[in-house]
Amino acid sequence: MLRYTKKGIESKERIGTLPLRMSNLLRYRGVNTPEEAECFLHPRLTDLLDPFTMPGMEKAVSIIRQAVREQWGITIYGDYDVDGICATSIMLETLRDLGAQHVRPYIPSRHEEGYGLNADAIELLAKESRLLLTVDCGITNLDEVALAKKRGMTVIVTDHHQLAEKLPEADAVLNPLIEPYAFKRLCGAGVALKITQALLGMDGVEKRIDLAALATVADIVPLMEENRVIVREGMMRMGTSARPGLKKLMELAQVSQPVNTGHLGFRLAPRLNAGGRLETAEQCVKLLTTKDEAEATAIATHLNGLNQERQAMEKQIVEQAISAIPAQVNFRTDFAIVILGQEWNNGVIGLAAGRICEKYHFPTIVLSQHGDLAVGSCRSIPGVDIHQMLTACKALYQAEGHGQLFERFGGHSQAAGLTIRAELVPELRRLLNRVIPQGDNCDLTCYIPQKEYELEVPLEAVNMALIDELNQLQPTGYGNPNPMLMARGLHVQEARRVGVGGAHLKLTLLDGANVRGGIGFQQGDLADRGYERVDVLFSPEVNEFRGQRTVQLNVAAMKQTGGSLLWPDEKMIFSALLQELTALASNYNTLSSADAQAKILPLRTNQLREKLRLGRGVLMIAHQSAWAKDVLSGGEADTDVGQVRDARAFNTVLFAPDLEKLRDDWRDVVLLDGETLPGLKDLIRQKCPNARLWCLSDAPDDLRKQLSAMTVSEDTLRGLYRRLLRGGTMAASALAQDCGMTEEQVLTGLTVFGQVALVSFKLDPYQLTLLPMHKVALTDSPLRKYLITHYAAETQM
């Protein structure tokens, strides 16, 4: 299921002399005046704010200059992610440029020490350093800062994370969230760059802005205001970087010119992160700061190998976690995916949680059990504050008279980490299912995936000029996304699968005389749908193939115009119906008398629409798309044929179910065609014992008429068999024409022949072979017997 949402309200007023379309795109990004537009579209280094407007900067600069002048021992205490690595590298180079002789980086082990300052490290570092300077951490380490002060250290805390109620009692504290600094969303390396700006001016900034750009993209902070300057200027300088390590890493990651945010976020950042995830991040600092070509090559090559190892490990954990979902998650009742695995790498489970959260659009907690404890990483969706929910779980558990739920936990609205006793993981699931639906700001419709678009454009406007216009918004990323556009009412001239295993969707889209190609990555299954007109969400892009440059639509989503559904092709539905009838016929006589009395409740169409409001838990069994369209009447649901492929139990119209693959995931199962198929409700009850079973009491008899038409006379079937004996083309359409039958009747007859061994017949893909002739009774076919028993009375035999 998918909803389209429009971002903001379009204005009819321009910003200065800018085109109306660009004016609206800028307004959606918080840009409202010509002056703001100039800064946004043409960011310059001179747009960086005065670093001394950040509270604590003057004191920090004074301490650093004294430490360098008096040659104190200095430790830069960082973090093991890309932001912490780059922030550490920036400060290390800055202090060395100032003349510091006794400065060292220290990055804690993710696996042995965890994030932030820790007492053991403080005790060690206090023996050799007089100044402790944190980057990308420390703002919540009140006890550890107090310990460092007690051990005689001078402490400067620089961080960008959320402020606690009380700040650490350091000698200087720098955080852009502290008022009155004008831009709040710098990353840790961005704060380090501001210190460099204060100490060395713009010359120092220009030498290190490449590292700040990499960290800004990797740490997913908004690409607005100062961050926009940092990323744009930093990427420009990467092309001529004097850093041997960065150059070698770019070479191994196949980063070509010009560098873009995708290169930073998806190619360079994972390789740097791999160091901290699997080994130590200090080697990454060495990579970014070394001037030795051989050392740079060795470290970059090693990190590239670690990243490949990390990818394999992540893939394995994701696959194992997804395979555990059926046993550990019930989408009918659960409000979070909570997966417990054994001995997974703690440095990779966060990536796995992110992948699963993105795939299922569900709050996700992936836990790895080590002995009696489980370490977990959480990722969430907009609308569910996972940190708030964990806090509520902790409070509820204590209110119930228990002890501590968590050994430790922390984070923010969309990501968190926790440690819990493994035996309490079932309790965590239970508590989440209580607190999430009761959350103050939780609208349960947030579980329905949404795609947001900014502007609606006609297909004729999707051209090179539009791409050039949108490119003015670069660099794009978090907070400044690549604009998503919508084109309505397009005709699908062609939809086919491409790529390995047909994973991707290749489209030809028309609007009058206007034709554009489209590509939908990981959407190959949409090629099998029946299309009328569609509304498409997309980003325009240039496709280069054999020297030709054309505009194509990078398709993010597609829905039927005027509704939320993409309806299956009628031939697909009939093929599945025939398989369903075959299964029903084979099982019909084995149903017990108790099963044959499975309780089913009447339901009217308007009552069904009320049940669909929550978006989850209703499975609608259908066999004819025209009636299903009437029932839904513009409502929201998924559609599938044979089996439901989405595990999340969104409201779904399932055509002709493969009963063996039906799962007990549903709150309600509704037979849209009424009780037309004897035995169907009984088999559904066996597969879905926890669901309430309904049938529409106002359903038409169209399905019964179709089934009656399929129940042809024995003379007609004999005529079909004689036609097979004559040979010639065996296509169903030709057989139908020669025998005066419909294709549906032919396919039904061939299925009957297959059951009595007159032919070898496969419906999908179509394969037909005559077998040696022998005497048979057609009623020995379970399908034939089922059709005659229930529908022959309405057929003129």
Put a short name on every predicted segment.
Residues 79-80, 108-111, 137-138, 160-163, ...:
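Short, ordered loop/turn segments at secondary-structure junctions
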Residues 91, 228-270, 274-322, 358, ...:
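Acidic, two-metal ion nucleic-acid-processing modules in DNA metabolism proteins
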Residues 135, 340-343, 621-627, 643-646, ...:
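Structural motif
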